[in-house]
Amino acid sequence: VSAAETQVTEATEATTLAPATDEEKAQAAEVGKKIDAIYVQNWSEDTEKLCKEAKEAWDALSDSAKAEVKGEHASPEYFGLDTGDVTKDNPLNQDEIGEKEILVVSFGTSYNDSRAKDIGGIESYLAKQFPDYSVRRAFTSQIIMNHILARDGEKIDNVEQALERAKKNGVKELIVQPTHLMQGKEYDELKETLDKHKADFAKVALAEPLLGEVGKDAEEINADKEQVATLLVQAAVTDGGFDSVQKAGQEGAAFVFLGHGTSHT
């Protein structure tokens, strides 16, 4: 056996966890219940307290017990997975908004690096393009907001909270820019929530999702959809190492585009 193989074996043995005791398994089960309790779509007055309690209970576990955490939605990855540096993400939940605001509404992601780069990138771009407006953030997935709050202590507003913040800060002109792909359930719920608050502002505008308005039928394709389709194909061809769609076709390449889907017709 080589010296390198010996080192690998020793390192593996050093990181092998001791079996969890019955007491540790019971503690892990309680943490699983606490995670499941905050894995919900509705916010309540107890949400922040429950998130804090779940994290404190996780931190108190031994490594062996953490490996035993499970539940309907709970797993060791809920708190244990490294998704990047949360301090690089700006939750944009500050007050002192001013009279003009762009509220960027996203489904959200609990992956810190992706959130800062992708969602944060859109928010930063809008802030540069519209310097007369304050840009703020809201997510539509309370499950994700709870995950971020519990694991990292970062508070992100849901839509209701963001609209209340805008009202409290005296915003008069509100533009809501969703990052949703299409007019699905999340977009419909956003419209419903916004309708309840329209009277709180002098001017309110809701932008369309990326793929634009729904046509009368599947044959109606608007300019937004055409542009997105063109850009997707260009990106796929480039990522595949081809100079053009024609070249890819000549070499027998096929590209498959997979979407999340929606029950909306």
Protein language model features and the residues they cover:
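Active-site-proximal alpha-helix that buttresses catalytic centers in soluble enzyme cores
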Residues: 4, 17, 73-265
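Beta-rich interaction/scaffold domains
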Residues: 4-7, 13-80
